Amino acid sequence: MNKDKLSEIGLALERAVRNDCEKNITISFSGGIDSALVAFLASKYANVELITVGVKDSHDIEAAKSAAKIINLDLTVKELNDEELISEAAILQKKLKLTQFEVGFMLPFWVAAKNAKNKTLMCGQGADEVFGGYARFRESIDNTNLDEETRSLLEIIPNREKKISKLFGLKLSCPYLSEGVIQASKLYSKKQHIGIVGKEKLREAAIGLGLSEEIANRKKKAAQYGSGSQKVMKKKIKHEINFEMPFESDKVAESIKKATDPENDGWVESS
């Protein structure tokens, strides 16, 4: 019976991926189970472009390189230096009015969307909410409500991932948030999903679908930490790096700062 349940999850996910596949698609890729499983399945139905984003030697770039090699897909690496990352962060914050935490989290997706060569952008968003992947779930299973986590994300997606996709003329695909996958996930309790390391049933289903155990059992860093964006953002706050777009005078900078508050949210500064 357990194999039947896992098969239901696998079939639902493969169906969701297949339904959104065009001839050519781009996948925002980190090398963790969420994006790797989507990429592995999509490669059966489409020509897949993988894009990973991060600072030099970041966890996501190294993980993505090894995962892409395992599933035998080409990988495009967008490696940003500190100034480039902060420049993109400023643009992202202005466009979407996100908090600093959200900017750090969404930067890899933003850069992937900006550089996508294909019109469909597929991602692994939703896997943690639907299948119980966050560490905080393991710390307090009794207080975890995966249905509520999923509903909350579905409300956020239109103003975040979907909006970014539209800005670059892309169609967004989030297979883990398809109705079929969400319903299939309910075959297991939250405790069974969360397990010891998180997303236990998704990992088992992924192996059943043929994904490498090495990838399926990987622990994944949060996007903002895996890509290195959060580290750079903290450096900005502490003024450890110097990224400047100089104005004619402090008076001009101060005038622009006041005129754009609260939109600039700390991005425009005067000395």
Per-range role (PLM):
Residues 121, 126-143, 152-238:
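Mid-to-C-terminal catalytic subdomains of enzymes
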Residues 9-15, 19-24, 33, 62, ...:
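Catalytic cores of RNA-modifying enzymes
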Residues 239-271:
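Long, contiguous binding/interaction regions
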Residues 56-113, 134-144, 185-194:
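ATP-dependent adenylate-handling ligase core
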Residues 1-24, 44, 167, 208, ...:
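RNA-binding accessory domains that recognize and position tRNA/RNA substrates
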Residues 5, 9, 38, 60, ...:
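Hydrophobic (often cysteine-bearing) scaffold residues that line and stabilize catalytic clefts
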Residues 24-71, 76:
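ATP-dependent adenylation/pyrophosphate-handling site
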Residues 13-17, 33, 38-42, 67, ...:
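Structural preference for long, well-ordered alpha-helical segments in enzyme cores
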